[in-house]
UniProtKB/Swiss-Prot annotation:
Residues 1-137 are annotated as: Disordered. SMART domains: KilA-N. PROSITE patterns: KILA_N (PS51301). Residues 22-34 have a biased composition (Low complexity). Residues 290-338 form a coiled coil. Pfam families: DUF3627, KilA-N. Keywords: Coiled coil. The lineage of its organism: Viruses, Varidnaviria, Bamfordvirae, Nucleocytoviricota, Megaviricetes. Residues 1-12 have a biased composition (Basic residues). This is Putative KilA-N domain-containing protein L37. It comes from Acanthamoeba polyphaga mimivirus.
Length: 487
């Protein structure tokens, strides 16, 4: 806006543009360095305000646009009134809410034009103007901060990072709020986090899909039953319908569903969103397993780093001892002896780690080749021997070491020899069933808890005061110890 001077009296510059300058020709005087600082601070304030407001929805942006238009019209009216009046000695333009960049440039040019007419003013006046400018700019900054604080009151804070209500950014009323679910807006209940799936389906799909179409599918019914079972909420309580004719509530009416159902409903309505959900789940599972591997590797790296630190320390000590040849030889011999101990410890540790790694095998991707260890109770009846034959020794238990793909055939052969046999214990997964049973048998025989079969390495009897319950407990303990990762 270009300000014209009156022929009778000097015009008074508005507080919003001059930030507290004096009336008359003195109010038009400011140094070029003050003007550049003035323009730079204005740009930082309004750029910051624009950046903060862009994160809110289109309703806030529309409101700000209408405010800017009304502010521009107000400035235009003031300009015409100043030019037409010859007797008015003072005028005042209200401070606009925001000065667009094109008006900011025009304002700067006008001030530069006015400066050329008052170059002979004293430096003291310029100093006063700069002081007033700083005060008013600080006031403007405070106003911008107050605006941002008022907007931040709409955001709902929650201490639980897994609560779905963390997506809320603005309240509609005491029950319903707006939220951002992925890349689109949703309506969410404040007290329980239920989301309006009717509106979501309308938003994400171009086809005429309805919520009841999804709910009637067999997959949806099974999912609803599962969510109800896990959460303890009745099936009817997983959905809340808001049906009202009120104009105010039209925006929020529809069916609100439990948060655990929403990803499946939206994936059904939008293939694009379904792909995003698959990507998130796959990334989560991959990262989870990756973190486990990283922890295992880190444990080994820490041990190696500790050994390396010890060796480095010894090497450093060796380099520091060079006072005399005798003393040096003595120190070297001592350090060599210690180094040999460390190296021996390192080799022993490395051997143990290698052995542990071979046994600590992760789960196989092929279930058919996974091993199982099954302890069977034979329940055989004693058979009277024929004349001239020795009585056949009866064993109470048999250890079966099988793979999943041959389990059926192995069990058939067992039941053929032991029709009344029953399962006592099953280890569903073990890296090596043969190795596990050999280790169990060796420990149980040494502790005099079982008597092994003479010709069969898998048949055995329990010794007195050693029960079947204790047998199961010991085998599980040995199995868990083998699968435990090294510390």
């Amino acid at each position: 806006m270009k300000v014209q001077k009156s022929s009778k009296k000097p015009l008074k510059r508005s507080a919003s543009f001059t930030n507290g300058t004096k009336s008359g020709s003195k109010s038009m005087k400011s140094s070029k360095s003050s003007l550049k600082s003035h323009k730079k601070i204005y740009k930082e304030i309004f750029d910051s305000e624009i950046s903060d407001n862009e994160s809110f929805d289109s309703e806030i942006s529309d409101s700000e646009s209408s405010d800017n238009e009304s502010s521009d019209n107000e400035s235009s009216d003031n300009e015409s009134s100043v030019e037409s009046s010859d007797e008015e000695s003072e005028y005042e333009i209200k401070k606009p809410r925001r000065i667009p960049s094109q008006y900011s440039k025009k304002f700067t040019d006008n001030v530069l034009d006015d400066e050329s007419d008052d170059d002979n003013q004293s430096d003291n006046e310029s100093s006063d103007i700069n002081s007033d400018d700083d005060n008013n700019l600080n006031e403007l900054k405070n106003n911008v901060i107050e605006v941002n604080k008022s907007l931040s009151k709409n955001i709902i804070s929650n201490g639980d990072i897994t609560d779905i209500r963390n997506i809320i950014y603005e309240k509609i009323d005491k029950e319903i709020s707006k939220g951002i679910y992925g890349t689109f807006n949703v309506l969410i209940m404040i007290h329980n986090g239920y989301i309006n799936v009717t509106k979501v389906i309308q938003y994400v799909t171009t086809k005429k899909k309805k919520f009841n179409d999804w709910k009637s599918t067999k997959q949806a019914q099974e999912l609803i039953e599962e969510v109800s079972s896990v959460t303890g909420i009745p099936v009817a309580g997983l959905f809340i319908a808001k049906n009202t004719g009120s104009k105010k509530i039209t925006e929020i009416r529809g069916t609100y569903a439990h948060p655990d159902l929403v990803p499946h409903i939206v994936s059904w309505a939008s293939a694009k969103f379904g792909h995003k959900v698959s990507k998130i789940v796959n990334d989560y599972m991959s990262k989870k397993m990756f973190d486990k591997h990283e922890q295992l590797i880190k444990g080994k790296d820490d041990k190696i780093a500790e050994l390396t630190r010890k060796i480095d320390k010894q090497t450093s000590l060796m380099k520091d001892q060079k006072s005399t040849i005798k003393e040096q030889d003595k120190k070297i011999n001592e350090l060599l002896s210690k180094s040999n101990e460390v190296l021996g410890y390192a080799k022993d540790t490395n051997r143990k780690i290698t052995h542990v790694v071979k046994e600590r095998v992760p789960y196989s991707d092929e279930p058919k080749i996974e091993h199982q260890l099954i302890i069977m109770k034979n329940n055989d009846e004693p058979i009277k021997p024929k004349k001239g034959e020795k009585a056949k020794k009866i064993y109470g238990y048999t250890a079966l070491r099988i793979m999943n793909k041959s389990k059926s055939a192995t069990m058939n052969r067992y039941y053929k020899d032991h029709p009344d046999g029953e399962t006592v214990l099953t280890i569903d997964y073990t890296p090596n069933a043969m190795h596990l049973w050999n280790q169990c048998k060796m420990e149980l025989i040494e502790d005099e808890k079982i008597r092994p079969g003479g010709t069969s390495c898998s048949s055995f009897n329990l010794r007195k005061e050693y029960s079947e319950r204790k047998l199961k407990k010991d085998i599980k303990r040995i199995h868990n110890l083998r699968l435990k990762h090294p510390e």
